[in-house]
C-alpha cells in the first residue's frame, strides 16, 4: 500500500545533508536512496516543486565546510529534476566579512556558538564567499533545470539556513512568494 505524504512535510536527507527538499510523493524513493522509475511517479506533476539546497563546492568533499559524501547525491538530483516542472535552487552566498565566520569573530573558534541579536549562531569557517569557486554549484550538478536561484546569507549581519527566511525568522528570501 502506497502512502502519500504531505508535500510540505517531505524532506529527503542524504548523508546528513538535507538535499534535496522534495515536495512530492515519497513513494518514488527506493530504500537505497535511488529513484525507482518502476514505482508510482506521483511527483513532478502540476504544481509539485523540487528545491535543491546548497549543492556548492564548499559543502562537497574538498571544500572549506564539506559534508562527507555530499557529492554522492548529485546524480540523484540530476535525475529527479528532469521530472519536475518547477525546480528551485538555494545558494549560500556570503560576503567575506560575514558575521558568522570565525575569521570575523576574534577569540572564537569554528563551531563555537555565540549570541546574536536574532538568537544563537554557530561560528563557521569561511565558506561560500560570493564570486569564489567555493560558492559555485558543484560542476557535476546540471543547473539548466533551475527556474530560480535563491541566494541567501548575503547580508553580513545575519546568517541563513533556510531557503525561506533568514535566521531571524522574519526576513524572507523570496522563495515563499515564488512558490
Task: Give residue ranges: language-model regions.
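Active-site acidic carboxylates
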Residues: 31-165
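Secondary-structure junction/capping motif
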Residues: 6, 138, 174-177
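N-terminal export signals
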Residues: 2-4, 9-30
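Non-transmembrane, interaction-prone segments in cytosolic or luminal domains
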Residues: 1, 83-85, 169, 178
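Short N-terminal micro-motifs specific to bacterial/archaeal maturation
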Residues: 1-2, 64
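Alpha-helical scaffold elements lining the catalytic groove of polysaccharide deacetylases
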Residues: 157-179
Amino acid at each position: 500500500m502506497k502512502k502519500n505524504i504531505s508535500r510540505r512535510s517531505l524532506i529527503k536527507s542524504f548523508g546528513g545533508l538535507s538535499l534535496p527538499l522534495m515536495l512530492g510523493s515519497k513513494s518514488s524513493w527506493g530504500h537505497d536512496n535511488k529513484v525507482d522509475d518502476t514505482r508510482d511517479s506521483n511527483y513532478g506533476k502540476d504544481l509539485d516543486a523540487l528545491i535543491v539546497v546548497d549543492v556548492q563546492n564548499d559543502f562537497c568533499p574538498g571544500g572549506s565546510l564539506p559534508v562527507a559524501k555530499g557529492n554522492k547525491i548529485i546524480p540523484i538530483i540530476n535525475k529527479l529534476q528532469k521530472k519536475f516542472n518547477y525546480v528551485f535552487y538555494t545558494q549560500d552566498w556570503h560576503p567575506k566579512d560575514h558575521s558568522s565566520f570565525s575569521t570575523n569573530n576574534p577569540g572564537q573558534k569554528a563551531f563555537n556558538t555565540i549570541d546574536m541579536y536574532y538568537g544563537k549562531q554557530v561560528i563557521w569557517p569561511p565558506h561560500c564567499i560570493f564570486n569564489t569557486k567555493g560558492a559555485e554549484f558543484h560542476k557535476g550538478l546540471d543547473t539548466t533545470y533551475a527556474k530560480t536561484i535563491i541566494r541567501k546569507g548575503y547580508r553580513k549581519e545575519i546568517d541563513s539556513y533556510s531557503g525561506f527566511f533568514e535566521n531571524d525568522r522574519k526576513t524572507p528570501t523570496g522563495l515563499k512568494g515564488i512558490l
